[in-house]
Amino acid sequence: MIQKDKTYNLATFFCLYIAQTIPMSFFSTVIPVMMRQENFSLSAIGLLQPWILKFLWSPMVDRHAVTTGDYKRWIFSSELIYAGLIFAVAFLDFHTDFYTIVALIIISFVASATQDIATDALAVLAFSRKDKSLANSMQSMGSFGGSMIGGGVLLLLFKQIGWNGLLPCVALFVIAALLPLFFNKGIRIQ
């Protein structure tokens, strides 16, 4: 892999990791608090953590993904579902549609976890042994950056522009973060 491709590949993976983490951090911060205010049990709030169960469907993703294109399809389809659900939630009223919102967020987390499975697998396959630590750094930076933005910056924006103004922007960001992968022809299984 030449240096330019490697740099672009690293940036692509950074975008994928930050795109999955920003909305998840926002929802994981806001929704549990609101659920407690609505007297949901802790076990019901625990349903917002489908990521811990992703080992149940990760073999299916791996079994149906052999080529770089297969993994990209998993990433695109799951991220587009993720963005679509975030966008749909933006048009629901938090007080009257609360149960629908929680259900859609849980489904969106499953889509995000599926994207993570495919992204992790592609990162492992696309980078040589000596570059795997760089790819892991992109994962860490994207995850930490996404947590700071989703759990911090978005909370401030949420207070300023509200649920209906914020979530369409978040959905568009998730889609925009797919663009580097869409245009990246340099990712190849090593």
Where are these regions (language model features)?
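Intracellular juxtamembrane helix-capping segments at the cytosolic ends
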Residues: 31, 113-127
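Central cavity-lining transmembrane alpha-helices of secondary-active solute carriers
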Residues: 44-65
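Glycine-rich segments within core transmembrane alpha-helices of 12-TM secondary carriers
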Residues: 51, 133-158
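Helix-loop boundary and gating motifs at the non-cytosolic
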Residues: 2-51
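Transmembrane alpha-helix termini and helix-breaking/packing motifs in multi-pass membrane transporters
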Residues: 59-63, 90, 147-168
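Symmetry-related core transmembrane helices of the 12-TM Major Facilitator Superfamily/SLC fold
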Residues: 77-83, 164-183
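Cytoplasmic membrane-interface "Motif A"-like loop-to-helix N-cap segments
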Residues: 63-80
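C-terminal ends and interior cores of transmembrane alpha-helices
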Residues: 75-96
